Design a protein with these regions (language model features):
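Low-complexity, acidic/polar, glycine-enriched regions of mature
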Residues: 1-162
Length: 162
C-alpha cells in the first residue's frame, strides 16, 4: 500500500451568487506527487504501518511517472474542471472532467464545502479505479507484483478570494 500526496495544487474557483453555478479549475503537476510521506502513512492506519524503504519509494515514483502510467514527460499536468454541482450545501456532488494524459474522463466528486467571508474549504473522499481514469495499474514480473486497481482519494483544498 502506498500513500501518494500532492500539496502543490493550483487553480481557481469562481463562486457565483447561485452556488450551483460556481466553477472549479485545478491543476496538479504530476512531478509534485510525493510517495509514502511517513507522517501521512501514520494517519492512514494499520494497513500503512510498515515502513517503506527509500529504494521502494524511489521505485514506486519512477513507475508512477513512467510512460506506461502517468507519462510525466509528455503529460506533466493533470487538469480538473467542474461541469456541474448538485446536492444540498454544504454536502454536494461535483461533476468534473479530469484530463489525464490528454484524455478526458468524467468523475463525480463528493464534497463538503464551507464558505466563510473570503475563504472556502472543500474536502471529501472518493474511490475510483485506475480504469476510471484511463490508466492501467502497474505490474511487473509477469503479474507477480501488481498495484491495487482501487484508488482511494482524500482531499482538503483551501482557497481565498483575491
Amino acid at each position: 500500500n502506498h500513500v501518494i500526496s500532492n500539496e502543490n495544487i493550483s487553480g481557481s474557483v469562481l463562486v457565483s451568487q447561485n452556488l450551483y453555478d460556481s466553477k472549479i479549475m485545478l491543476e496538479l503537476q504530476v512531478t509534485d506527487f510525493e510517495v509514502d510521506n511517513a507522517s501521512l502513512r501514520k494517519i492512514e492506519g494499520v494497513d500503512f504501518e510498515k515502513e517503506v524503504s527509500q529504494k521502494d519509494i524511489d521505485g514506486t515514483r519512477v513507475n508512477m511517472l513512467a510512460e506506461k502510467l502517468l507519462d510525466a514527460e509528455k503529460f506533466p499536468i493533470i487538469k480538473i474542471l467542474s461541469s456541474s454541482i448538485d446536492g444540498k450545501f454544504p454536502n454536494v456532488n461535483i461533476e468534473a472532467i479530469i484530463n489525464i494524459k490528454g484524455v478526458e474522463h468524467k468523475i463525480i466528486v463528493p464534497s463538503t464545502i464551507e464558505i466563510e467571508d473570503k475563504y472556502f474549504v472543500a474536502k471529501g473522499y472518493l474511490e475510483l479505479t485506475h480504469g476510471d481514469l484511463g490508466l492501467v495499474p502497474f505490474s511487473a514480473a509477469g503479474g507477480a507484483l501488481t498495484v491495487r486497481d482501487l484508488l482511494v482519494l482524500k482531499y482538503e483544498i483551501f482557497g481565498k478570494s483575491l
